[in-house]
Swiss-Prot record:
Domain of life: Bacteria
Protein name per UniProt: Fructose-1,6-bisphosphatase class 1
Subunit structure: Homotetramer.
UniProt keyword Lipid metabolism present: no
Family note: Belongs to the FBPase class 1 family.
CDD domains assigned: FBPase
Pathway as given in its UniProt record: Carbohydrate biosynthesis; gluconeogenesis
Cofactor(s) needed for function: Mg(2+)
GO molecular function ontology, one term from the record: fructose 1,6-bisphosphate 1-phosphatase activity
EC number: 3.1.3.11
Keyword Endoplasmic reticulum among record annotations: no
Substrates-to-products reaction catalysed: beta-D-fructose 1,6-bisphosphate + H2O = beta-D-fructose 6-phosphate + phosphate
Gene Ontology biological-process entries: fructose 1,6-bisphosphate metabolic process; fructose 6-phosphate metabolic process; fructose metabolic process; gluconeogenesis; sucrose biosynthetic process
Species, as recorded: Parvibaculum lavamentivorans (strain DS-1 / DSM 13023 / NCIMB 13966)
Length: 343
């Protein structure tokens, strides 16, 4: 049986009854092409001068890695000329990136985290690129795009995905018809379909969380993790393994393939901030993929894809993965809320 490339897959999606729009198909291909370029930069590493920090900080107040800036520029340059986008937004930029007047303007909005897990770059662990696509409001063709046009709940995404730069370079994609995996064939220069309609396996006893923050967690999160750590002698009557890479792409990829739960919850160090991860660049696209694969994505109390964003760089707590495990964490939050109300 011949291999199916990303282009062939997207054309097939375009021919179906609920057809993938041609402009969205072309946009996804351009994003995938940019990810190939970023993969090449990651692979060159120190030989290409890609490693190390810059003196600048991004809008999040984080010191930028060289590769953060390079990947951001690659995505901007690849996507601004195609005529498919009305504007772009990046985790690395304070404001939105308007399409230059010399290029035609399209009907979609692209958001991305150019390099997720960039703290892993210098130690040669997996990093990735996360992206999300929204439809621009109909009236943007006659006016300038604003940040408000991006502030749509995650359920309105029309496509989302990530590239993971590890032993293989993989592209994980959903256009609303399931989750598909493509591997970069470097000899062909093509993305080749390697796994289709991915479903999160149920019952895997693994959790991904940064245990060093345990003392700062809210009681429902602490309760869940304490029960996991108690193993066969605790209420779960099963042993659990912890996995943590400090790269959301790597941890979520493992959960899509093996099951389990990923958590980056609110903690008491910054009580006025809802969480660490960015809603628009990380939680929404990953939540979209997790739900398309049969899982659940909550902030602890609410479905992530239903959150109405108030700001472009809004942060949120994240609990996503196996449906049964996420339901348990959500129930613990509800129990804690009820206890507060009746106290």
């Amino acid at each position: 049986m011949s291999q199916r490339t990303l282009t062939q897959f997207l054309i097939e999606q375009q021919r179906k009854e609920a057809a993938l729009p041609a402009q969205l198909r072309l946009l996804v291909e351009i994003v995938a092409r940019a990810c190939k370029t970023i993969s090449h930069c990651v692979n060159k590493g120190a030989l290409g001068g890609m490693l190390g920090n810059l003196t600048s900080e991004n809008v999040q107040g984080e010191v930028q890695k060289k590769l953060d800036v390079i990947a951001n520029e690659k995505l901007l340059e690849a996507n601004e000329w195609g005529g498919h986008l009305a504007a772009m937004a990046s985790e690395e930029m304070e404001t939105i990136h308007l399409i230059p007047n010399r290029y035609p303007k399209g009907e979609y909005l692209l958001l991305f985290d150019p390099i997720d897990g960039s703290s892993n770059i210098d130690v040669d662990l997996s990093v990735g690129t996360i992206f999300s696509v929204l439809t621009a409001p109909e009236d943007v063709s006659g006016r300038a795009v604003t940040e408000a046009d991006f502030l749509q709940p995650g359920r309105k995404q029309v496509a989302a995905g990530y590239a993971i730069y590890g032993p293989q370079t993989l592209l994980i994609l959903s256009v609303g018809t399931g989750v598909y995996e493509f591997a970069l064939d470097r000899e062909m220069g093509s993305w080749v379909l390697t796994n289709e309609r991915i479903r999160i396996p149920s019952g895997n006893r693994e959790f991904a969380i940064n245990m060093s923050n345990m003392r700062h967690w809210a009681p429902p999160v602490r309760r869940y993790i304490d029960e996991c750590l108690a193993g066969t002698t605790g209420p779960r009557e099963a042993n659990f393994n912890m996995r943590w890479t400090a790269s959301m792409v790597a941890d979520i990829h493992r959960i899509l393939k093996r099951g389990g739960i990923f958590m980056y919850p609110w903690d008491a160090r910054e009580p006025d901030r809802a969480g660490k991860l960015r809603l628009m660049y990380e939680a929404n696209p990953m939540g979209f993929l997790i739900e398309q694969a049969g899982g659940m994505a909550f902030d602890g109390n609410h479905r992530i894809l239903d959150i109405e964003p108030k700001a472009l760089h809004q942060r949120v707590g994240v609990v996503m993965g196996d449906r049964d495990e996420v339901k348990r964490v959500v129930q613990y939050h509800h129990d804690a809320n009820l206890a507060k109300q009746t106290a």
